[in-house]
Amino acid sequence: MVSALLLRARQNGRAARCLDYPKVKCWALASLPKSSLEKPGFSQVRRFSVFHPQSQVNLDLTRNIGIIAHIDAGKTTTTERMLYYSGLTRRIGDVDEGSTVTDFLPAERARGITIQSAAITFHWPPAECGNATRQDPRSPRSASSHMVNLIDTPGHADFTFEVLRSLRILDGAVCILDGVAGVEAQTEQVWHQASTYNIPRIVYVNKMDRDGAAFGRTVREVASRLGGWPAVCQIPWFEGGDGRFVGVADAINLQGLLWSGGDGKSVKRFSLSELDEAESQLAQELRRARVALVELLSEHDEIIVEKFFENEEDHLSVSPADILDSLRRCLLEGNGRKIIPIFAGASFRNIGVQPLLDSVVDLLPSPQETPDPEVAIGGVKGSLRRLLSGDLLVEQKEKAAPKGKQKKKAAVVADSRNAIKQLHGCGLAFKVVNDAKRGVLVYVRVYSGSLDRGSLLYNTNLNVSERAPRLLKMYANDAVEVDSISEGQIGVVVGLKHARTGDTLVACTTNKATPPEPLDTLQLRPIDVPPPVFFASVEPHSLAEEKRMHESLALLLREDPSLHVSIDEDSGQTLLSGMGELHLEIARDRLINDLKAKATMGPIEIGYRECPLGASGPVTKIFDREIAGRKGKAGCTAEIEPFDPETSPAPDPAALSVEIANGNQIVILAPELQIETNKKGLEESPILPPGLDVDAVRSALSNGCLAALARGPQFTFPMHSTRVTLTLSPTAHIFGNETTSASLSAATRLATSTALSNLISNPASASATPGTCLMEPLMNVIISVDEASLGAVVHDISSSRGGHIVSLDEDVPIASTDLSIPNTETPDPELDLPPIDPAKVYAPPDPFQSSTVVGGSMASDARNRPRTITAKVPLKEMVGYLKHLRSLSAGRGTFVMSVDRFEKMSPPRQKAVLTELRGVY
């Protein structure tokens, strides 16, 4: 009884104390054009004066975080409260009204969902005239104002790449769960994606004010489905034990936090003794939560064990600062896989957001505390820290030096350190946006040094240099100009014509067009792009509009690399491929409404693949014609055969290269090449003509082969599960200076295309099966329904849709269902933890799920119990499935899916699909 608690506290002379979340006194609108201030909705955003002009940034006081979750879990709603309480906005935006700061695209406001990630910067605790202090901080960290660079990410599965490229540059994340739905399918997907990048995460259980919210059940699902030990830092506070949700009980500080007032700024704090007087049940549960928290930490952190013994083995006597330090150590050491701190709240009711912000500052890492970024330079891979120390350059130079001509160790070290001194800044372009007024905006995370306004940036992926005329600090759709973007910060470079997602940008002290060797080869780990599975034709309204349409498509692809454009050689149609139906719908809206392309998009179709049924035999082709006014002549031999990663024999160990691309294996044989390494670390051969090194040969042969594999010989779909063996003979295929990269690529494409055609007309042997067959995307599908709908949904998947049920469980751990891009890194054996038994996890009881319920409500609870179906289903059968699922589950079912693999069709199914595609086959 909250009112009784307040009254008793006053009667005893212990007035409830307000939490010291500083009031913001010194806000100022940045100097922006009046036209900008007149924009609808813009007036709510205001900025810290310390952001403009740019000041020196303390990395210890910086947090680069993302908000990740299932769709409709409350990501944007929580973000709006964070901006409001930090003082950045004057009012709280509403998703339903379309007045949010981070969802600013017309399509986002119309649909009420996040489509593209939005970056925004604020301070927590709020800075007061550039100097923030808190009289009663939770920890030394939350006593100082921190700069928080926050990215609000989409929750829909079709925008997986938008989440991936945001996670690539983040240091920490807040995963928001719906307290009613618990851990949903898309939650598992984004959690697994964050794990591949080793990002520490905390969990915020939202919507605790809703009917059916179950904090305890959600905690147990975190353990069983996300694979970490839940560290319950807060428990929900319901008025009278089972009334409305009014606040949280803090297990770290042993206090109750009660929210009152419409905007949530009024927060009152009650000690454990005060809770004992009026909320004894809550106080007892809070003690149990503290004991469980200390016990859990003691299993993973030796220091907290020492603190426990220093406090006479009293769990309640361990200081909050010691607990926070222990939580932070466990979180950072395990990268969010061992310990998962859990908090509670109801963002829409303005409850729980300020303590969540405190936890972002207290628990999540600064840029200096994150795992060392991976880099590659001159063919040598290592960490950024090794590069900056000079050790990686020493290794690269020693590897590149010809045998017998190595310099002394001291000289190599001196050269390496001198080279590193010329590196002024290094950053990764993780997003490109075409803004109607500002032009092309390239979002950059700086990992070393700084990128300054007016400096020359060298793109090591494209080998081009561009000047950075303007630099911006973004606040969703608005921006403030800055002089530089320093290490650990996220900013925007305006006006770059060539930079793409995943490119590395380097600035050197020499400010020359090309950095000194080998800095011109420095590359940060790129961003993986998942394969598209849907496509639609795009046609201009007239021939005069065709050029404009292709220019708009090029801009669209630069913004979103998960889209793909190809040309159907038979029909001449332009095909746009994407991750899902909604993905292509949004791309169409962007193309027509924003980029003003006068074009029409056809119906959305499935991207099938073609695979060989037999081998082709070797085919040799000589290309001999002019290319761009220059005579070119080269040759190549290609041979086609089926490929299966598990059953196909290993390629020739003497191969020049073996590459897996788009599900195909390309093997390059060049037995007669005499390969040597030059002083730059590049491979050369005296047999090759000048200007053509071994890497250029590899690239030319690979590109030519990939171009041919993009179109199958029988059904015109891209090839898959195909091994192409390319053989290059210097005596038969190299013709002096006439042989260039372009002619080699053209010869390879010609040979590979002919070999593909021979699969049908001239197979390798009379016994070989001629032709190719179709492959279709087989999807990993996770469906969430209640017990009452389980039978109908399982029957529909296994019979009507030709799917295969993998598991039928209440709890499906993420490790068993990979819904993401495969992780190419070697897993840490210490983090390969066994499944967690939910029975061993502390979780507070849920007041609305009592076992003493009488009558038929127990049966009703059983029928409403959430169940999870994991299945593998052909993509064709999942098109439009959501509407059907909702009809089977009374509107409560949800699902998420991603590509598992491409699978060969049976002859009857292939015939049916071709009949549907072409009318009659």
From Swiss-Prot:
Its main location: mitochondrion. PROSITE patterns: G_TR_1 (PS00301), G_TR_2 (PS51722). GTP binds at residues 69-76, 152-156, 206-209. Belongs to the TRAFAC class translation factor GTPase superfamily. Classic translation factor GTPase family. EF-G/EF-2 subfamily. GO terms for cellular component: mitochondrion. This is Ribosome-releasing factor 2, mitochondrial. It is found in: Mitochondrion. The keyword Transit peptide applies. Mitochondrial GTPase that mediates the disassembly of ribosomes from messenger RNA at the termination of mitochondrial protein biosynthesis. Not involved in the GTP-dependent ribosomal translocation step during translation elongation. It comes from Emericella nidulans (strain FGSC A4 / ATCC 38163 / CBS 112.46 / NRRL 194 / M139). Coiled coil: none annotated. GO terms for molecular function: GTP binding; GTPase activity. The gene is mef2. It comes from the Eukaryota. Pfam families: EF-G_D2, EFG_C, EFG_III, GTP_EFTU.
